[in-house]
Amino acid sequence: MTVRLASVSISNFRSCKSTSAILRPFTALVGYNNAGKSNIILAIKWLLDGSLISESDVYDPTHPVSVEGVIQGITDDTLSLLTEENQQKIAPFIIDGTLTFARRQEFNKETGKAKKSLDVYDGTTWKKNPGGIDGAISNIFPEPIHIPAMSDAVEDSTKCKNTTTIGKILSAIVSEIKQEHEEKFSKNISEIGKYLSHNGENRLESLNKIDSGVNKKVNQFFPDVSVKLHFPTPTLDEIFKSGTLKVFESREDEPVMRDISRFGHGTQRSIQMALIQYLAEIKKENSESKKSNTLIFIDEPELYLHPSAINSVRESLVTLSESGYQVIISTHSASMLSAKHAANAIQVCKDSNGTIARKTISEKIEELYKSSSPQLHSAFTLSNSSYLLFSEEVLLVEGKTETNVLYALYKKINGHELNPSKICIVAVDGKGSLFKMSQIINAIGIKTRILADCDFLSNILLTEHKDLLSTECDNLLTALIESINSGELSLNTKVTTFESFKSISSKDFIKICNHEKTQKHIHEIHQKLKDNGIYIWKSGDIEAVYGFGKKQTEWDSLLDCLCDESKDVRAVIKKYDEMEDFIKWI
């Protein structure tokens, strides 16, 4: 396993009064504006670099700031990055390949001066400021690459320092070239040194002439002192670290170099993302090359990008996360999350207690349904779960039939589109996972409702809803048994108790929904469930409401009606009142 930062706990940093998060090789922070996503990223950066923070970076200046981190995957290879002295200093604190440490800073109330410390956990107690640990962490994790939301793009792209974002990316890109040509480059650089250094074999005669002239003046004051001009040649590292970008625009005659500030933010952002994509490409092609431990932070990678480019950037970031880089992004775009990674995305929100990083879908699956976690992970992966994280409420529906037309029906009946930031419709493959997925989504702080066929009642009666519906279900069971015994209703399953509902087929449930003596009780159950966030079709299933089944011509007729403002949907949907009631319930 590649060494990585596995988790952080943040206290009193900016908007983060107290929150924690589990980090993965690819971690996405999602949430509305000003929720504190960028503050979590900055807290992680501060944990690693230990720069001095000001009082404006503190939630409550009367209390210390603390960010605790856990590094996992430390091996002998990792320790080889350290000096022997630092290896000895850090070794007592590494437990099963894990290092737990915390960076703290507090302000003296009287003087206002800041006091910093780096504490390390030895398995039983915290040790304050043990020597060598800060340097060891810096060697394990090179300085992170941070691409903010375009605030310093122009200045950053024109600087000639490896401390800039582009400088760091360029350094990572050319590292393979540097290793490949190091001997050749170093030889050529040393040749230049022979002409310019104070003791060069082929020192320029003009430099000797200057030395002679200057020494005549110096010797007038100090006869035993002499000087020689010396121009140090840059090392190969220094040359590559000074790399920058020149931007050219095509013209009829020849390309013209222009300052990057003359280009729009879209072009600037595209250049940054292009470098990230190319870095991912070469790392994927050179799978045998040494993996990096560098962290990459990007605020809103989707910013200024064309929708078709967002998916490409996402895949590049995932590739980097599989090549040793640890990638942490903040995003407002569901396109930045594949279904595979949505379950591990961290929803960030803010309330009166500051910024909170909620537990992920994966964490809640393990917490609530550990025994069936593989099936639930699959269920979330197969649904469009990346979109639900950006909504205030989720409507879970059974199967994709409903989602195919519900958005269009909503617009047709209500006269306006369903706002995806308010409500997201998520299709679930079969009714068996509806309750479990609902509980998990509710557990991560998103309100959830359910739409299902009437046969979902067999699942409902196995939950706490059974007590809620006890009177209505007793009445239904009594009416059902009477109708069966009298021969008025014929079912394929013998019904004597609530438990026997589990064996009733969907076709038989439709019969029950439309039978004169049981219909009233189905409507009572429907209303009570509706008031509690579950909508079951009173007619049995959605096909019964539409009035048709699977024929493509019938669906085409409905879709044609939904797309044509002049056509009345009442003429197409058999039980329009029931459909309208559901749409208004949304």
UniProtKB/Swiss-Prot annotation:
Residues the entry annotates as binding a divalent metal cation 1: 398, 453, 455
Gene giving rise to this polypeptide: old
Effect on the protein of changing residue 306 to A: No longer kills recB-recC deleted host cells
Outcome reported for the amino acid change (mutating residue 37 to A): No longer kills recB-recC deleted host cells
Catalyses which reaction(s): Exonucleolytic cleavage in the 5'- to 3'-direction to yield nucleoside 5'-phosphates
GO-annotated molecular function: ATP binding; exonuclease activity; metal ion binding
Species per Swiss-Prot/TrEMBL record: Escherichia phage P2
Residue ranges, annotated region (ATPase domain N-terminus): 1-163
Name of this protein: Old nuclease
